[in-house]
Swiss-Prot record:
GO cellular component, one term: cytoplasm
Top-level taxon of the source organism: Bacteria
Protein name: Phenylalanine--tRNA ligase alpha subunit
Entry-linked PANTHER family: PHENYLALANINE--TRNA LIGASE, MITOCHONDRIAL, PHENYLALANYL-TRNA SYNTHETASE
Cofactor-binding details, from the entry: Binds 2 magnesium ions per tetramer.
GO MF terms, alphabetically ordered: ATP binding; magnesium ion binding; phenylalanine-tRNA ligase activity; tRNA binding
Span of the signal peptide: none
Family named by the database record: Belongs to the class-II aminoacyl-tRNA synthetase family. Phe-tRNA synthetase alpha subunit type 1 subfamily.
Record field: catalytic activity: tRNA(Phe) + L-phenylalanine + ATP = L-phenylalanyl-tRNA(Phe) + AMP + diphosphate + H(+)
UniProt cofactor(s): Mg(2+)
Keyword field: Aminoacyl-tRNA synthetase, ATP-binding, Cytoplasm, Ligase, Magnesium, Metal-binding, Nucleotide-binding, Protein biosynthesis
Amino acid sequence: MSLDPVKKLVILAKSNIMQSNNMDALEAIRIKFLGKKGYLNQHIKNLNDTSLDIKPKLGAAINQAKEDIYTLLIERKNILQSKNIKNTLITDTLDVTLPGRLSDIGTHHPITSTIKRMKIFFNTLGFSVIHGPEIEDDYFNFDALNIPKYHPSRDEHDTFWFDEKRLLRTHTSGVQIRAMINKTPPIRIISFGRVYRKDYDQHHTPMFHQMEGLIVDSNVNFSYLKKILYDFLYNFFETDIILRFRPSYFPFTEPSAEIDVMKKQETGNWLELLGCGMVHPKILHHVDIDTEKFSGFAFGIGIERLTMLQYNIDDIRVFFKNDLQFLDQFK
C-alpha cells in the first residue's frame, strides 16, 4: 500500500471541511474521517497487510493525517462560531426605544416600617429596646401586674393556655416586670413583640404586635407621660390630628388613661389608640422598688392599630394575608 491514498484522504477532508456551513455538517465530516468506522481507521486496520518496509512510513502518515484533519476541523469550527455570533448580533439588535425590564424590589412590611419608626423616635429619648419570651407564665403575665384571679383576661375564651401556669402572652408587660427585677432605677425601656388573644374580626386577630414603654425614676409624673406620648403621636402621623386624654382603668396603672385620636378632616370620629398611666405602687413593691423614692409610668400601643390609622386601612386582617397587590402599595 502506498502513501498516496492517505494524502488524497487529507485533500478530500480539507475540501469537505471548507464547504461545510454549519456545526452539524462539520460534526458529520469529523465522524466520516476520524470516527471509529471512519476512513483513517480503515487504513489503520489495513496496516497488518502492508509490507514491513513501508509500514512505519504509512503509520506515521496516517497519524499526521489525523492531526492535519483535526486542526482543519478546529479552524473551521472557530470560523463558523464567529459567523454565528455576528449573525446573532445583526438579527438580535436591541431596540433602545423599548421600555426597560423593571426588577421587583423588596420593601419592608408596613408593620415592620412602623416598628422601625417607633424605635428611631424613642431611641432619641434615651429608651433602650429589650425583649422577652412569648410563652409566659401566669406570674409575669398576670400576678405581677396586679391582675386579679377573677379578671376576664385569664379566662380560656380570651387567652391561649398551655396548662395551668403557661400561656401565650396577652401583652408585652411581662418584659417590663423582668426589666424592673433585673435593673435598678433609673429605668427607661421599650419592648416590641407579638402577643396573642382569642379574637378574630375586622379589628382583631389572634396574633398582633404591641409596643410598651416604661420609665421608672425619681422625678416622674403624669404630665411628663402626656408630653412624651403627644410628641410621639404628632411626630408619627406628620399631619394635623387632634388628641384627647380620657380617664380609664387598668389593674397595673393608677391613675390610668387612654388616648384617642381624630384627624382634623374627620371631625367627630374619635379612635381609641393607646393606654397608659402611672405604674401602680403594688407593682413597684412586687419588684422591690422603693415607692418613697421612685415612681414610674407605662404605656402600650397596638402597632397594627397605629399602622391602620396611618394608612387609612379598615381591616387588620390584610396585614397577614401576604397579598402582593396590597403590599406593593408600600414600596
